[in-house]
């Protein structure tokens, strides 16, 4: 007798074959039968019209803190994900040196926009070594499977302390100490190692991430910790010095290849198109294809959708944040800020101003992409387009929708009318 039969579902089996209708029988937690099932079962579920798929494996997540208090890995569990890989982009919470917890929180808050207050409340930091961190997670119940990578930034901070935050070059002794900690973590069960080299990644305090300028000697020295082990993967996120000089692309990519060679393991790297990057993604693809042809196991991580951020007056980012007229009231409680922004004189002033170039903590950065915004916070709905003009960031009032129509109708017409793709824009 089977434990469970799911009847008449549309099955996507993960092989690349076309979807098909079938029954699926489960016994002892594993698929036992597939097809038209007449075997008796303790439970039968009619599922016509439902899709039945293998569980998804999400290889790029940042549950490093949440995993220590949330057994569900929400929201991934709600989207069919059954395995997650954490510790990406070189940020995480282990190894940890007591007294430096706030620095790790500021790092994750700044890079991944995870609220620092939630991390400070939820992450207990009842570990020091990476092995102890894994033991803490392993002792908790979890609804889905997970694996963890050793992030470069905490590793560097554990060995170099304040020198890591100052981005000092690692000495041979520093590299040897980091390599030992990494090797110990891999032998304890860590899935891999990650590093981040993006100019857009900053801590919540506006600092560059500790390992973003790590030398070739440091990167290859750490990668060599994988030698002789039967498992492991390296993960790299890099913008290849996009905001500095196009001539830096190849030297930066050379570092990625050097890490793969030194490790003898597979290397997975983020593959994104960034504005103002032109067609950098094609250059990345060409270098990867050449490396693979030469025998290096490089793999690309491609996002299945456009990546944006949450914007709002009570969020980390919103289009008003750089305008002097807003910054005067930025520290007021939300209700008082909203009231101040309803003042016609302040509204007119903000719309006439140009924004400073800012990041989350107020440091100058280059604005990445134009975006459109829909607001219901003033006297009726208003749509805006934010864009660069002459190297500066402008916030333009471009349309007041017909209030007799649903806002998404007039907003969509607005975007189409100015030649912007509706689905490619983050909308608030």
Predicted regions and their residues:
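Histidine-rich, glycine-flanked metal-binding segment
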Residues: 2-55
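Divalent metal-coordination and catalytic microenvironments
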Residues: 9, 29, 49, 60, ...
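Short, ordered loop/turn segments at secondary-structure junctions
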Residues: 36, 89-91, 198, 239
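Di-metal (Zn2+ and/or Mg2+/Mn2+) metal-binding site signature of metallo-dependent hydrolases
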Residues: 52-75
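Active-site neighborhood of phospho(di)ester-bond hydrolases with catalytic His/Asp-centered motifs
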Residues: 53-60, 86-88, 237, 270
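Divalent-metal coordination cores built from histidine and acidic residues
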Residues: 69-192, 229
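Active-site neighborhoods of metal-dependent hydrolases
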Residues: 133-137, 143, 149-159, 166-172, ...
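Targeting-peptide/extracellular-domain and disordered-appendage signature
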Residues: 391-428
């Amino acid at each position: 007798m089977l434990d469970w039969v799911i009847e008449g579902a549309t099955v996507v089996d993960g092989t690349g074959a076309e979807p098909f209708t079938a029954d699926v029988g489960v016994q002892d937690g594993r698929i036992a039968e597939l097809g038209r099932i007449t075997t008796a079962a303790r439970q039968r579920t009619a599922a016509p019209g439902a899709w039945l798929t293998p569980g998804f494996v999400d290889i790029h997540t940042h549950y490093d803190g949440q995993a220590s208090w949330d057994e569900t890995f929400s929201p991934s569990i709600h989207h069919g994900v059954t395995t997650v890989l954490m510790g990406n982009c070189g940020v995480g919470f282990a190894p940890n040196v007591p007294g430096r917890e706030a620095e790790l929180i500021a790092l994750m808050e700044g890079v991944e926009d995870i609220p620092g207050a939630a991390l400070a409340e939820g992450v207990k930091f009842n570990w020091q070594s990476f092995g102890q961190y894994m033991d803490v997670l392993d002792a908790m119940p979890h609804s889905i499977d997970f694996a963890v990578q050793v992030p470069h930034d905490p590793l560097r901070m554990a060995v170099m302390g304040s020198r890591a935050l100052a981005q000092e070059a690692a000495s041979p002794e520093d590299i040897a100490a980091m390599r030992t900690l990494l090797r110990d973590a891999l032998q304890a069960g860590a899935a891999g190692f990650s590093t981040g080299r993006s100019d857009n990644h900053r801590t919540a305090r506006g600092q560059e991430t500790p390992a973003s300028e790590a030398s070739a000697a440091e990167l290859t020295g750490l990668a060599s910790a994988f030698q002789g082990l039967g498992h492991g993967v390296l993960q790299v996120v890099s913008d290849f010095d996009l905001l500095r000089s196009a001539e830096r692309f190849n030297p930066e990519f050379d570092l990625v290849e050097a890490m793969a060679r030194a490790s003898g393991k597979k290397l997975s790297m983020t593959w994104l198109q960034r504005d103002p990057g032109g067609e950098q993604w094609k250059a990345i693809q060409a270098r990867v294809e050449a490396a693979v042809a030469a025998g290096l196991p490089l793999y690309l991580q491609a996002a299945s959708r456009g990546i944006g951020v949450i914007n709002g007056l009570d969020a980390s980012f919103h289009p008003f944040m750089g305008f002097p007229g807003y910054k005067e009231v930025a520290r007021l409680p939300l209700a008082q800020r909203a009231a101040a922004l309803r003042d016609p004189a302040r509204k007119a002033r903000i719309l006439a101003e140009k924004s400073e170039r800012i990041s989350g903590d107020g440091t100058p950065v280059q604005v990445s992409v134009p975006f459109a915004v829909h607001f219901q916070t003033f006297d009726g709905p208003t749509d805006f387009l934010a864009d660069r003009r002459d190297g500066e960031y402008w916030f333009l009032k471009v349309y007041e929708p017909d209030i007799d129509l649903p806002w998404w109708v007039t907003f969509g017409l607005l975007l189409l009318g100015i030649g912007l793709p509706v689905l490619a824009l983050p909308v608030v």
